[in-house]
């Protein structure tokens, strides 16, 4: 490769994704089970695409990111930047394996924090209301949306396995609604009374309920996380009414969340819908239908599913070039 090379890594629900930003951009994803069982190595996959010693800076995310509140070098981070792995959905160990590989690789690497009660840029009322607001990849998604749109005041809704919606004012993230307290995603969602009773009665754990509180609950789907979205869409293609209702209901909860954040904002320049479902047009026009529900607030745009992965690389690039704050989050160097 010629010129500077930046890498972004996202520890997500269905796998670990990498973006390499050099003269061109390249994306690849490794499934969680492949990593946790040792069938795949993140560094082997990475060095097949770029010599590791040519990487100028890498920015990564891990789990909830709730034990750090600044972007900092990985060697300064304790316990992978988390308070606990609990409450984060299904745990397979794949993300932990990748983190350990990167930590010992010698590649210059920054860890991006999540948004939580100790994040200084958040409005104090959000910090008082919720212990956790968004996992770290949402910061990079917002940064990409910020660079792509130029909007200083916007709402970004990332819709996929879960839904998390962020509020940005004057170029700073001031609020967010996490997956367990706000809108539904395909898999995850908020816990309702029935689920709380099942937890109290010992029928299910809170994490089991959280991981079945999204659209899958309505559609009656109980399958692997990596298969849930496709199974839901297969049911929709087959004309199954429970699949249509699941998608319609999920969309309603997201529209409620967006309207709620708009209502407490000081003004919105635009709304960005992203994620595998937020950008979906076929077979169910989720993006178009949701856009119609919120377009009275402001202009609505969609971020390409690959382009949104650039956010971590863009953070690495801009910090390498001297930036010391990302959307209100301090950078330690």
UniProtKB/Swiss-Prot annotation:
The lineage of its organism: Archaea, Methanobacteriati, Methanobacteriota, Methanomada group, Methanobacteria. InterPro entries: ATPase_NBD, Methan_mark_12. This is UPF0285 protein MTH_1441. Gene3D superfamilies: 3.30.420.40. NCBIfam families: methan_mark_12. Belongs to the UPF0285 family. It comes from the Archaea. It comes from Methanothermobacter thermautotrophicus (strain ATCC 29096 / DSM 1053 / JCM 10044 / NBRC 100330 / Delta H) (Methanobacterium thermoautotrophicum).
């Amino acid at each position: 490769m010629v010129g500077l090379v930046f890498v972004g890594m996202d520890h997500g629900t269905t796998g670990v994704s990498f973006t390499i930003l050099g003269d061109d951009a390249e994306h690849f994803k490794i499934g969680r089970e492949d990593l946790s069982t040792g069938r795949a190595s993140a560094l082997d996959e990475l060095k097949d695409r770029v010599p590791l010693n040519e990487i100028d800076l890498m920015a990564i995310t891990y789990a909830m990111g709730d034990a750090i509140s600044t972007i900092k070098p990985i060697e300064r981070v304790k316990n992978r930047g988390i308070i606990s792995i609990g409450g984060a959905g299904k745990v397979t160990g794949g993300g932990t394996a990748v983190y350990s590989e990167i930590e010992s690789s010698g590649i210059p690497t920054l860890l991006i924090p999540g948004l939580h009660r100790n994040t200084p840029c958040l409005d104090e009322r959000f910090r008082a209301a919720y212990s956790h607001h968004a996992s770290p990849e949402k910061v990079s998604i917002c940064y990409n949306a910020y660079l792509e749109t130029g909007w200083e005041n916007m709402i970004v809704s990332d819709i996929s396995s879960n839904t998390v919606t962020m509020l940005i004012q004057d170029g700073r993230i001031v609020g967010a609604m996490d997956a367990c307290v706000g809108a539904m995603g395909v898999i995850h969602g908020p816990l309702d009374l029935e689920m709380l009773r099942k937890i109290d009665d010992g029928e299910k754990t809170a994490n089991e309920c959280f991981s079945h509180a999204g659209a899958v609950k309505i559609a009656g789907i109980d399958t692997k996380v990596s298969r849930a979205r496709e199974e839901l869409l297969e049911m929709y293609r087959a004309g199954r009414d429970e699949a249509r209702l699941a998608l319609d209901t999920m969309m309603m909860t997201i529209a409620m969340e967006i309207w709620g954040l708009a209502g407490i904002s000081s003004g919105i320049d635009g709304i960005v819908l992203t994620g595998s479902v937020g950008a979906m047009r076929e077979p169910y026009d989720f993006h178009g239908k949701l856009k119609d529900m919120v377009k009275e607030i402001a202009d609505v745009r969609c971020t390409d599913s690959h382009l949104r992965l650039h956010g971590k690389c863009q953070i690495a690039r801009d910090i390498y070039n001297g930036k010391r704050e990302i959307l209100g989050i301090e950078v330690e160097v």
